[in-house]
Amino acid sequence: MTRGVLAVACLIGAAAIAHAQQRPDVSGNWMLNGGKTTFAEWHLTDAGDRRFKAYDYKKDDPALKCIGTSWTRVWLNPNVLVKVTQNPTDVRLQYEWMDIDRRIPLVDPTAARLKRSLPIPNMPGLGTSVAWYDGDALVIETRDIEPGYVSTMQEWAGLPQSRMMRTIERLSLANPNLLSIQITHVDPANYRDPLQVTITYPRSKFELMHYGCDPKDAQITEPNK
C-alpha cells in the first residue's frame, strides 16, 4: 500500500470513527413509569377545534380495535416497555404496547430521495418514517399519516391529525438512565402552529413481553379531563 493510499484509508477510518462517536447511545429498555409527559399549549384551527370537540371516547378511540393512532399515543402508554436497538443502517424500536415493531432506515436527510420504513400493518395513522442523527439526538421523521388522533388519553384525548400531519421525534439522553422524547406535530389543517409534546422514559430492567391485544377484551374508559 502506498503512503497516499494509506493516508486516505486512515482519513476515511478516522472519519468513520468520529461519525460513530457522534451517534448518541439511546439503545436499551425504557418504560414510561416514573417519567413525565408535557403537552405545550395547542392552538387549533377552526376545523381542528371542531374535530377535537366532536371526539367521542366511547366509539372513536382506535385502541379499542388494537390500533395505535399516532406515535405520541404509542409513547404515552404506561406500564409497557420500549426496546431501542441501534444498527449500522437502521434503528429498531419495539413497543410492547400493541406489539408494534418499528424498523426505520438511517438516511441522509438532505438526499433527494429517501428510503422510508414499511407501513406498520393495520395502523395507517403511524405512517412511514426515516431516521438520522443530529448531534446528541436520534431524529425520526414520519409522514404518509392517515386521519386520526394525536392522543386518546387524559385531557389531550381527541386532539386530531390529518393527512397533512408530519411528525418529528427527537430521542436523546437527559441523563444516562432517562430517555427524553421530544415530539413535534406539524399539521396546518388542524393546528395554527406545531404541537409540541415531551415524554421522558426511565431506563428499565424489565424485558420485552408479548402484549397480545384482542378487541374483545377492550374496556371503554373515560379520559381524565
Question: What do the predicted segments below correspond to?
Answer:
Residues 5-15:
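Bacterial N-terminal signal peptides
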Residues 1-2:
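N-terminal secretory signal peptides that target proteins for export/translocation
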Residues 20-225:
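PEST-like low-complexity, intrinsically disordered acidic/proline/serine-rich tracts
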